[in-house]
């Protein structure tokens, strides 16, 4: 819940409370996040950064980070939603396949999908995707989002994105220009009422293709 303006960098940081808003408040279930203990807040949020970090170990140990007791079935379900099951299954050892420090032995898109799967295993109340689909091709992006909706139906999903197709079906879209909010609404509402958003849509796709 946003009550006053804050810049894009602050918007990304404020939900997990890496920084506090300078005015207004962010509420989770009606409670100001500044009134929550940081560790309690973090337990409710699954953060997936644009450039995620993978630890030296196995695919399974990376996915179990934060939930050590997750079963193999839970891991494969999360991998399936994240569109990562096929490439993990093709790796020698599957869940036991080795991951180099920082994930240097997998591609950028594979790192993003593994990080998304890691967050999905936690099943948090809030998912914060910080441009987490940027390394994915459009088809993979679309399949992942379609699978994410039923999987995370009990959670709030917040997506920071540059690509219109990634957020076109969101319940609410907040448009930022130079770090300032210039529009809030659904895709169709913003195409009709927000020149900045309409220009972005026109520059990326035809309105008909996205709607």
Question: What would you call each of these model-derived segments?
Answer:
Residues 13, 114-119, 143, 159:
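ABC ATPase nucleotide-binding domain "signature" region
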Residues 16:
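Helix-to-loop junction immediately C-terminal to a conserved catalytic motif
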Residues 23-27, 35, 42, 60-101, ...:
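ABC ATPase nucleotide-binding domain helical subdomain, centered on the C-loop/LSGGQ "ABC signature"
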Residues 90, 139, 146, 150, ...:
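C-terminal portion of ABC ATPase nucleotide-binding domains
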Residues 121-125, 154:
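A short, proline-enriched helix->beta-strand linker immediately N-terminal to the Walker B motif
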Residues 127-130:
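Catalytic Walker B motif of ABC-type/P-loop ATPase nucleotide-binding domains
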Residues 150-159:
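Conserved catalytic loops of ABC-family nucleotide-binding domains
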């Amino acid at each position: 819940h946003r009550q006053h303006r804050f810049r894009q960098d602050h918007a990304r940081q404020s939900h997990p409370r890496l920084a506090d808003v300078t005015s207004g408040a962010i509420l989770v279930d009606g409670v100001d996040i500044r009134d929550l203990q940081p560790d309690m807040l973090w337990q409710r949020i699954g953060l997936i950064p644009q450039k995620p970090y993978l630890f030296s170990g196995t695919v399974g140990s990376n996915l179990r980070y934060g939930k050590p007791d997750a079963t193999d079935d839970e891991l494969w379900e999360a991998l399936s939603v994240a569109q990562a099951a096929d490439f993990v299954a093709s790796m020698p050892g599957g869940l036991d396949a080795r991951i180099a420090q920082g994930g240097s032995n997998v591609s950028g898109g594979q790192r993003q999908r593994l990080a998304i799967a890691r967050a999905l295993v936690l099943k948090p109340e809030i998912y914060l995707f910080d441009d987490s689909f940027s390394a994915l091709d459009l088809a993979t992006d679309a399949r992942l989002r379609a699978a994410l909706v039923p999987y995370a139906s009990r959670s709030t999903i917040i997506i920071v994105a540059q690509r219109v197709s990634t957020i076109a079906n969101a319940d609410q879209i907040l448009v930022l220009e130079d770090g300032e909010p210039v529009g809030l609404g659904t895709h169709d509402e913003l195409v009709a009422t927000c020149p900045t958003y309409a220009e972005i849509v026109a520059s990326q796709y035809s309105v008909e293709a996205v709607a």
